[in-house]
């Protein structure tokens, strides 16, 4: 048969035949024979390779034999362009056509060519005999691969073993111990089994937030199936996870995707209920593969799902379920919902304890139980935009990976010694070129120093290598223990209790003794001298990782917060002068909240600061951010004068759908999503439009706010401060007169009630009145301002000193009871900063000098000192 008509062959078969002339040319041969075709089939890495694999043959070995056979054939010294079809290949193609008729197919496919090789006297017969591939065995393998399929089109190979190509057998992975253990989730697994056991609509869909463990439930079911911990209806079933990406990828022609999916579904239905399909991200089937009139995957699934012919478990997030599945009511009714909630912190700790061994073996480190508890608690507290247990597992994984990296990298002490040796070696080279006695003396000293460092290097290197070796040995033994545990489980499943007992009480016990001995050896090495390597993940490692993720400084997480909170009042007093009552009220409210006595579903604290301008309202908010969250950047400042119009209110939460800027999110909500631990300052709230307070009610009462895109933003870890100038005139009237304080307070509160609704005022924790500043208090504020200026001058290597008279002068000229401390800042700029700036520009002050500022004749005088020497 002359292979001139590609329409008689399948695409893959013709592709291999078309490649044979090229292979013959490469080997300078003029006739195309069966060996060239077999070489082309093996190169495809398709059905031919699969047949050889199932026959138990080694593909590289078969390849070598074919190539060796080709190399032995006669070669032409100068081959002509014309290439002929050899007699053996002609006969092979005739036999392939006979095989095609025998199987009742429409096209010659690769399996027909493989069957024809069994009668090929040139190469095929001998090769098959060598690998033990008889005619019956080949027929069995072809039947196993094809199932009940017939070759009715030119691309049948894409439909063979579809589940193997486009799916992962979870039960097989569970049997091999490649799935992580699933802890808890019994209720959800039980409900899934219950739905799978129904007669019709036996399709559960697992719905939950990303990272709560939906896929883990499917894996847990696979583990239960292999442990026979399921009802009779699910005993010995296969759970196969379908990869929608692989199913769609490479489907070039119209209808090819549908063909692949139909082949998968046919394989599942042909199994008579033996296969359960798991589709992760099930929303991807809606609309998948739909192009101009083509059916999408969801519509292909519907008939089978309804009549119970296909048992399918789906998994998707709440948002995607609503967006894709709920829109298609016909698809939705075929699935039964199983809601997967986020586990609480205690359940997460149990999950982490169950996974601990897996991560220890993988990374070759130990993980302390305190680290697991810290991972669950800190991730729950500090990472609000992700869900447990996923975020806690990620923390443990990353902390263990970091420690593993440190073990394999050179220790810091050794690195320092290496650098020092390199530096001394370079110094020695330059000294060897010198001939004077001082250089020779220095060289002698350097040689001794170098010898000492090299000795230390050798000692440290030896210690590092020995510690590293023991840690590696522990890891290897633990991996073996893991493997033995798998073998024990397999033996128990096979009811081979003799083997299980032999492994458990023989091999496993020996390995556990080995681990104990190695751990003791490592402990001795580490206690005998200074340990170079650490092989246990601790609480501090978890805190360090979370600090990198969230930007909250590590000391904030590890340092005893009690200590910090006890000293909060003193810290605030040192920065905010003359507002003792306000500082005490703020500190006490935060202490109550952090001690766990305030409502956990509301913000940490909320205050209204009332008082005239320049008395320290905003300064106290900044000081609070700095002391609680270690940076003033944790202060989210929103100027309410920007929200005077009704339409501007939407800027807080983001523009509604359909408006410009919808994708950008809100100014307030985005800031808190990025940094959930913040002090929020709403400056001058009396200027805001009334609708702003409707938004505030929700934040103050529930500690949450939903932005325009539907994200719920958590305000439970924020401190909310609102400032206002309302009633300032009454506060200034009684400045310094404590006897009239209550009268003033009631008048100020009357003004507040006139301007704000009672439901708003009622939700605020405390309304704090800031007093007008007294002249005596301004001196302390001057010192704070001077300290700030002195710090800036230090960068230019200048020191600043002010006499008491100079301080009193600045306090006097900067005092204005109406404007508070702001005129003081202007006075420091006018009388002090300007004069020093001019002096620096004129060159009066040189680096290293001290600028002494005094007051003479109601003006400041400046003197420059170098040491005790006065420079005029």
From Swiss-Prot:
Q: Name one Pfam family in it.
A: ClpB_D2-small
Compartments, record wording: Cytoplasm
Residue ranges annotated as coiled coil are 393-527
Q: Which UniProt keywords apply?
A: ATP-binding, Chaperone, Coiled coil, Cytoplasm, Nucleotide-binding, Repeat, Stress response
GO biological process terms held by the UniProt record = cellular response to heat; protein refolding
Its main subcellular localisation, reduced to a broad class, is: cytoplasm
Cited PROSITE patterns:
CLP_R, CLPAB_1, CLPAB_2
Superkingdom, according to UniProt? Bacteria
> What protein name applies here?
Chaperone protein ClpB 2
Species name? Synechocystis sp. (strain ATCC 27184 / PCC 6803 / Kazusa)
| Taxonomic lineage from the root | Bacteria, Bacillati, Cyanobacteriota, Cyanophyceae, Synechococcales
Annotated gene = clpB2
């Amino acid at each position: 048969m002359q292979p001139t008509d590609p329409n008689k062959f399948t695409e893959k078969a013709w592709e291999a035949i078309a490649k044979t002339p090229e292979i013959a040319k490469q080997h300078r041969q003029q006739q195309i024979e069966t060996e060239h075709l077999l070489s082309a089939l093996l190169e495809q890495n398709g059905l031919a390779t699969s047949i050889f694999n199932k026959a138990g043959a080694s593909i590289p070995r078969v390849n070598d034999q074919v190539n060796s056979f080709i190399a032995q054939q006669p070669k032409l010294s100068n081959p002509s362009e014309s290439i002929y079809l050899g007699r053996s290949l002609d006969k092979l193609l005739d036999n392939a056509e006979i095989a095609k008729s025998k199987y009742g197919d429409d096209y010659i496919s690769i399996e027909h060519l493989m069957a024809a090789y069994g009668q090929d006297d040139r190469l095929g017969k001998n090769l098959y005999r060598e690998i033990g591939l008889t005619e019956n065995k080949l027929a069995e393998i072809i039947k196993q691969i094809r199932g009940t399929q017939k070759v009715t089109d030119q691309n049948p190979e894409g439909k063979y073993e579809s589940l193997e190509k486009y799916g992962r057998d979870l039960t097989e992975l569970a049997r091999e111990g490649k799935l992580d253990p699933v802890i808890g989730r019994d209720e959800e697994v039980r409900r899934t089994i219950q739905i799978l056991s129904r007669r019709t609509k036996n399709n559960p869909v697992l719905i939950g937030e990303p990272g709560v463990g939906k896929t883990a439930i499917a894996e847990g079911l696979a583990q239960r199936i292999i442990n026979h911990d399921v009802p009779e209806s699910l005993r010995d079933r296969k759970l196969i996870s379908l990869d929608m990406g692989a199913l769609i990828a490479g489907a070039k022609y119209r209808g090819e995707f549908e063909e692949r999916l139909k082949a998968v579904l046919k394989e599942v239905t042909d199994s008579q209920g033996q296969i359960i399909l798991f589709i992760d991200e099930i929303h991807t089937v809606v609309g998948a593969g739909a192009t101009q009139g083509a059916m999408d995957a969801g519509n292909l699934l519907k008939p089978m799902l309804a009549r119970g012919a296909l048992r399918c478990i789906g998994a998707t997030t709440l948002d995607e379920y609503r967006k894709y599945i709920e829109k298609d009511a016909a698809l939705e009714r075929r699935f039964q919902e199983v809601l997967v909630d986020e586990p609480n912190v205690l359940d997460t700790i149990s999950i982490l304890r169950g996974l601990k061994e897996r991560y220890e073996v993988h990374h070759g480190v130990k993980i302390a139980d305190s680290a697991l508890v810290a991972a669950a608690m800190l991730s729950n507290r500090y990472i609000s935009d992700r869900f447990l247990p996923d975020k806690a597992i990620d923390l443990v994984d990353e902390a263990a990976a970091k420690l593993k990296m440190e073990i394999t990298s050179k220790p810091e002490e050794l690195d320092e010694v290496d650098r020092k040796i390199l530096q001394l070696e370079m110094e020695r080279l330059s000294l060897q070129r010198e001939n004077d006695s001082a250089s020779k003396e220095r060289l002698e000293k350097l040689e001794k120093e170098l010898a000492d460092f090299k000795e230390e290097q050798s000692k440290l290197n030896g210690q590092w290598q020995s510690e590293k070796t023991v840690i590696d040995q522990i890891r290897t033994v633990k991996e073996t223990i893991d493997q033995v545990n798998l073998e024990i489980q397999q033996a128990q499943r096979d009811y081979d209790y003799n083997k299980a007992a032999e492994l458990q009480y023989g091999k496993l016990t020996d390995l556990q003794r080995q681990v104990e001995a190695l751990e003791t050896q490592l402990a001795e090495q580490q206690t005998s001298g200074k340990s170079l390597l650490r092989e246990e993940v601790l609480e501090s490692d978890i805190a360090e990782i979370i600090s990198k993720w969230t930007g909250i400084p590590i000391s904030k997480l590890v340092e005893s917060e009690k200590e910090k909170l006890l000293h909060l009042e003193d810290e605030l007093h040192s920065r905010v002068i003359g507002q003792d009552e306000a500082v005490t009220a703020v500190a006490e409210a935060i202490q109550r909240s952090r001690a766990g006595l305030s409502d956990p579903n509301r913000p940490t604290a909320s205050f209204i600061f009332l008082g005239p301008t320049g008395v320290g309202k905003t300064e106290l908010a900044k000081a609070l951010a700095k002391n609680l969250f270690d940076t003033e950047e944790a202060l989210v400042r929103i100027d309410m004068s920007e929200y005077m119009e009704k339409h501007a209110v939407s800027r807080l939460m983001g523009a509604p759908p359909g408006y410009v800027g919808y994708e950008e999110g809100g100014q307030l909500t985005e800031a808190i999503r990025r940094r959930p631990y913040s002090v929020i300052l709403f400056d001058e709230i009396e200027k805001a439009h009334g609708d702003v307070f409707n938004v505030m009610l929700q934040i103050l009462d529930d500690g949450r706010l939903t932005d325009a895109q539907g994200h719920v933003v958590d305000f439970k870890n924020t401190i909310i401060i609102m400032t206002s100038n309302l009633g300032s005139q009454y506060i200034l009237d009684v400045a310094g007169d404590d006897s009239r304080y209550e009268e003033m307070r009631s008048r100020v509160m009357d003004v507040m009630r006139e301007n704000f609704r009672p439901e708003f005022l009622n939700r605020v924790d405390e309304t704090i009145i800031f007093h007008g500043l007294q002249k005596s208090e301004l001196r302390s504020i001057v010192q704070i301002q001077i300290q700030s200026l002195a710090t800036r001058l230090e960068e230019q290597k200048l020191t600043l000193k002010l006499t008491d008279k100079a301080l009193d002068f600045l306090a006097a000229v900067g005092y204005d009871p109406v404007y508070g401390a702001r005129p003081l800042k202007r006075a420091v700029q006018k009388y002090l900063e300007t004069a020093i700036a001019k002096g620096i520009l004129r060159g009066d002050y040189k680096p290293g000098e001290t600028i002494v500022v005094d007051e003479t004749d109601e003006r400041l005088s400046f003197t420059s000192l170098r040491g005790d020497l006065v420079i005029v």
